[in-house]
Regions:
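Short hydrophobic beta-strand that contains or immediately precedes a catalytic carboxylate
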Residues: 14-16
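Short active-site-proximal "capping" loops at secondary-structure junctions
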Residues: 19-21, 28-30, 66-68
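Short beta-strand segments at enzyme active-site cores
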Residues: 58-65, 168
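Catalytic-core segment of enzymes that process non-peptidic bonds
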Residues: 62-71, 77
Length: 211
């Protein structure tokens, strides 16, 4: 049986927060993610999916968290817990190594980097939806960090906006198995039309390229 196909005219890969602070040894948040990320083979799988998308000329979009800058949040009346954590830890600090995209995942010319999101959803208060629609994208293959926060929030919002979502379940990670279970087994299945492995999506993209 042929694998599920992805029409590259209307499908894009969405890469969420591949920052050094998340997915590189020495990153501020890596130690919290390391156990689950390594068990899930998260980073190599993310790279495999990204390379497959590029090789098959699938459009690639990036949804990136706000890089911390001095003064961020200081005058806000309310700060969500996840924002407070980013503020206190200066996560993804602008101008630092941790705030850079890991080298293997750096966007190439022609790949679209949406405006940075301030909380969790890659869509909220950014131009991601506009960029996708202006490029004729209706279907998303989603991967990145963190499964129970930015990834889940972005998948939910994508469904609300009418996108058909495929979630790559072994190209993401959370702080614990419990949080991974909540994201991938409980919440995301309500919004993603398909939840697949890296091998499945890579095979699908390769199949499409041969047609």
């Amino acid at each position: 049986m042929a694998p599920v196909t992805y029409d590259k005219e209307i499908t894009a890969l969405l890469v969420i927060d591949p920052y050094n602070d998340f997915i590189s040894e020495g990153g501020k948040i890596w130690d919290r993610l390391k156990g689950v990320a390594e068990a899930n083979n998260c980073v190599p799988n993310m790279l495999q999916v990204l390379n497959a998308a590029r090789e098959t000329e699938l459009r690639v979009f990036y949804a990136l968290h706000r890089q911390y800058r001095p003064g961020d949040y200081e005058t806000w009346k309310y700060i969500a817990p996840t924002q407070k954590s980013a503020w206190l830890h200066k996560a993804f600090e602008h101008g630092t190594w941790g705030g850079e995209i890991r080298k293997e995942f750096e966007p190439r010319p022609g790949e679209i980097v949406a405006q940075e999101h301030w909380c969790s959803s890659g869509f909220a208060n950014t131009d991601l939806d506009l960029q996708l629609k202006k490029h004729g994208i209706h279907k998303l293959i989603v991967m990145g960090l963190i499964a129970h926060t930015c990834v889940e929030a972005t998948v939910r919002y994508a469904a609300e906006l009418g996108y058909e979502v495929t979630m790559v379940k072994d190209a993401t990670a959370s702080y614990s198995d419990k949080e991974m279970h909540a994201a991938l087994k409980v919440n995301i299945p309500n919004y993603a039309s398909a939840i697949v492995t890296t091998n499945e999506v890579v095979n699908s993209l390769s199949w499409d390229a041969l047609q």
